Amino acid sequence: MKKEEKKEEKTERNEKLAFWEVQRKGTNFMNSKSLPDNYKAAKEQNIEFIRLAPDKWAKDSDYLFNDKPDTNPDKDFLIGNADKYEGIVEEDFAELKADLDAAEARGSKVVLTVLSLPGDRWRQFNNYENDDRIWKDFSYHEQAAVFWRDLASRLKDHPAVIGYNLINEPHPETATGFHDFWTQDYSEWYSSVENTPADLNLLYETIVTAIRTVDSKTPIIVNSGLYATPWAFKYLKPLEDENVLYAFHMYEPYELTSQNKKKGFTYEYPGTIKVGDNKTEKAFNKEALKEFLEPVAQWAKEHNIPANRIVAEEFGTNRLVKGADQYMADLISIFDDFGWHWAFYAFREDTWDGMDYELGTEPPTWAYWQAIEKGEQPPRTAVDNPIWEVLKKGLERKE
């Protein structure tokens, strides 16, 4: 009887981690407000988990949608003010809790992330300038750790939450003169910042230690540096915690995926694209994408990190790029071959339509934006849509 009891306790203790034992396929929610019905819609598309960033909920719709000034520039969701953390904002937490409850009611699992930490306000909420204070002052490491400890103590038993992603796209490199992995030497750079506030590994150790004082079971997910580039795995150190997953984002070549009507659509996939500060021409196809991801695969091999501890946490391209469907298909194929978890960006994002793949290659209608501004689901008409078909196929459950 005692053995059975111990077995039950062990199963219960590792339930959240057990979610990640098999490959999982998800998406990202980074909307202007809580949109509970999107959980149901995602579930209907076989999306197994949602990576949720609630930071935009702190801002007025006029600022997010109509290019009006930010009436609350010092207001940061949950943390109050990125200048100094003084405790979780109760009103914000109540809103987050209601959203997570809605996710659970609709059968969705959630990885919670944040776009800002103390001393690291999200660039888009910081006059489009990097906030690098956390990479220059250890006191912000400590504030970030206290924030996550406080949040984990409240969410550790929430059944929908299957991961804490400590910070979205960290960028200590920007504070210390490193910005182009195509031309700069990562080893040389890291040796110059190791054991300083710009050492991402130290920040993670500090936060993880704090979380584990109140929550021993919820998996923690950490991003690589320079906006979660695969190449920053070269200096990432595995944490001494078995409940940790390691994540990267994939929008490379950025010169391809970030094209839009304003920039123009110069490149297509597969094709030759100019990359890096020196604008080197490089051919991109499936093999080149796999080569770009090699630092992740090599790092995992060197450190004996299993495939089910690696997450392609964001990937995508502007849906109007020629060859977008093939780009997404090739990445999904690569992730599946490695056995990595993946989450495309994004599903029904309400502040931007560039990666709303259900729209295909069609511009949004006026009715679409009217519904969005009202916080309603826009009408979605069936279109000839190869890119969404790629995602639907990738999301199919393999029995």
Task: Put a short name on every predicted segment.
Residues K322-E399:
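Aromatic-rich peripheral "rim/lid" segments of glycoside hydrolase catalytic domains that contact
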Residues P54, V114-S116, M250, T317, ...:
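Short beta-strand segments enriched in hydrophobic/aromatic residues
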